[in-house]
Amino acid sequence: MKLHEYQAKGLFRDYGVSVPDGIVAETVDAAVDAARRLEEENDATLFIVKAQIHAGGRGKGGGVKLAHSVEEVREHADNILGMDLVTHQTGPEGQTVRKILVTEGVDIDQEYYLGVTLDRETSMNAIMVSTEGGVDIETVAEESPEKIQRVWVDPSIGLRPFQTRQLAFAMGLEGDAFKQAVASIQGLYEAFEENDCTLAEINPLVQTPGGDIEAVDAKVNLDDNALFRHPDLEEMRDLHEEDPTEVKAGEHGLSYITLDGNVGCMVNGAGLAMATMDIIKLAGGEPANFLDVGGAASAETVEAGFRIILEDPNVEALLLNIFGGIVRCDRVAQGVIEAAKNIDIDVPLIVRLQGTNAEEGKRLLDESDLSLRSAVLLKEAADEVTAALGED
């Protein structure tokens, strides 16, 4: 789950990270009121109007504008709200802007990068800093990796004071700015760890001419599997920013990710799902989705899975690959039969059932009047996919 910038900034502020004052707005009038409030309470004379979508590269796409007056805020808000903002992370269709953040402007002397993420190779948390702030850290890592400094934090020990100082030194800071950077690093790490984040990022973290350290942007990704421990964060979820098909799948307890291929697949277990996608590619097709029905597959979830997959007009064949451990194959087969009664399955259907009650499941399918192709081995399933695509 991703947070909007304004939500991430609010979270960071709770952990002592200095963040410029800002107010979120959903209408032009609300944006103007926000600017006037910042003008009155903070003596702000410079404003930044920022589109709130779950994607980077907003500035290059026209979603971040500088305003020197309240009237300019009105003009920019009118242009940004409702626009389909296209960035390198949204795809060509873009994302509709429904909210903007109006913040007071900050004079910038130097930009830095600060981020915390999970390093799966070491099973530790990695904190990264760079003097190349304000640009994609991936670009810096590729072109100038020596400009990124990292420390790894063992979760069983926690972040040590010498590590925060090491990072602040790597940023080239001294004096009060050094102390503020140490506090920002400590606060960001605590926010990351205590809220089960997979990523907490400030890009850029800036130093003002007066030597203050401010987080002028913020990004947070949360671990979906830990959201039950953070109901306050789960309430921040913005379904408008997520794939509607994936949201619908989640409502049925299905793990679904849309892909660009032509073969739909329904599988139980993430490992088997990835192996199935490999099989589809070897067969000459491209997977149209990742769909894991999990360990509690029922007739209802199978039918929901079929509906979701078949909504994709690019699907030319459908492979159902089930290994029955906790899942009973006869229950899945019954789900297929029930789904076929309620849905027009107008593409070739290949079914592979192995494991618990597989023979009973095959019997149910054989005795039904469904037009489908059965497979026992993965290779057979691949051959059937090849044949189905060749007939199209």
UniProtKB/Swiss-Prot annotation:
Assembly notes: Heterotetramer of two alpha and two beta subunits.
Domain ATP-grasp span(s) in chain numbering: 9-248
Recorded family membership: Belongs to the succinate/malate CoA ligase beta subunit family.
Name of the gene this protein is made from: sucC
Metal-binding keyword on record: yes
Annotated binding of Mg(2+), by residue: 203, 217
Pathway: Carbohydrate metabolism; tricarboxylic acid cycle; succinate from succinyl-CoA (ligase route): step 1/1
Matches recorded under SUPFAM superfamilies: Glutathione synthetase ATP-binding domain-like, Succinyl-CoA synthetase domains
Domain of life of the organism encoding this protein: Bacteria
Residues annotated for substrate binding in this entry: 268, 325-327
A biological process from GO: tricarboxylic acid cycle
Cofactor(s) in the UniProt record: Mg(2+)
One Gene Ontology molecular-function label: ATP binding
Keyword Disulfide bond part of the UniProt annotation: no
UniProt-recorded name of the protein: Succinate--CoA ligase [ADP-forming] subunit beta
InterPro entries given in the database record: ATP-grasp, ATP-grasp_succ-CoA_synth-type, ATP_grasp_subdomain_1, Succ-CoA_synthase_bsu_CS, SUCC_ACL_C, Succ_CoA_ligase-like_bsu, Succinyl-CoA_synth-like
Residues binding ATP: 50, 57-59, 106, 111
PANTHER family tied to this protein: SUCCINATE--COA LIGASE [GDP-FORMING] SUBUNIT BETA, MITOCHONDRIAL (PTHR11815:SF10), SUCCINYL-COA SYNTHETASE BETA CHAIN (PTHR11815)
Catalytic reactions on record: succinate + ATP + CoA = succinyl-CoA + ADP + phosphate; GTP + succinate + CoA = succinyl-CoA + GDP + phosphate
Cofactor remark from the record: Binds 1 Mg(2+) ion per subunit.
Organism: Salinibacter ruber (strain DSM 13855 / M31)
E.C. number: 6.2.1.5
Keywords noted in UniProt: ATP-binding, Ligase, Magnesium, Metal-binding, Nucleotide-binding, Tricarboxylic acid cycle
Function: Succinyl-CoA synthetase functions in the citric acid cycle (TCA), coupling the hydrolysis of succinyl-CoA to the synthesis of either ATP or GTP and thus represents the only step of substrate-level phosphorylation in the TCA. The beta subunit provides nucleotide specificity of the enzyme and binds the substrate succinate, while the binding sites for coenzyme A and phosphate are found in the alpha subunit.
